[in-house]
Amino acid sequence: PEELVLTVRAGTALAEIEAELAQANQMLAFEPADLSGLLASKSTGTIGGVLATNMSGPRRLTAGAARDFLLGFDAVSGRGERFKSGGRVMKNVTGYDLSKLMCGSYGTLAVVDEVTIKTLPRPETSLSLLFGCNDMGSAVAKIAAIFASPHEPGAAAILPQNVAVAAGIDMTAAFIVVIRLE
């Protein structure tokens, strides 16, 4: 990935993309969730699946959704016609922005074959803070207080206790607030 732009086939595994980006000290800003640990299964997610569902992870609050990082794509319409939308550079302002429309369409508008996405430099350091909360209201209040503070969290999530336990977090509170500082 050069110039913080990556072009891949839609069926490319997320694990493969993340490994390549890690070598270049880059990352996917929207941080798609890897649910394989929670589901006790092998990670099989693809970048096409992430974009078709617009699945954005805990960094969405600060970085934006997956659709905000799709620069362009090649696809096949329902009539079997190949078409392209967007571009391979950030300064592409011609025509309609079909990229945002395609994200979250679950493949109903076209079959995407290739995507070009914007990447970001990986932070030099990262620290996750965990807070136990006994109810959802206090968990939401904790996140609101942190985002209202002078600190700039990179990601935030609220995990129910059963999900936290499945992820290997040993805390007894009903909800676990996870805040990442970068």
Segments (PLM) and residue ranges:
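C-terminal substrate-binding/cap subdomain adjacent to the FAD-binding core in PCMH-type
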Residues: 52, 71-182
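Short conserved micro-motifs on helix faces and helix-strand junctions that flank
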Residues: 8, 45-46, 104, 111
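N-terminal glycine-rich flavin-associated loop
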Residues: 1-43, 51, 55-88, 93, ...
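Beta-rich nucleic-acid/ligand-interaction surfaces
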Residues: 44-45, 164
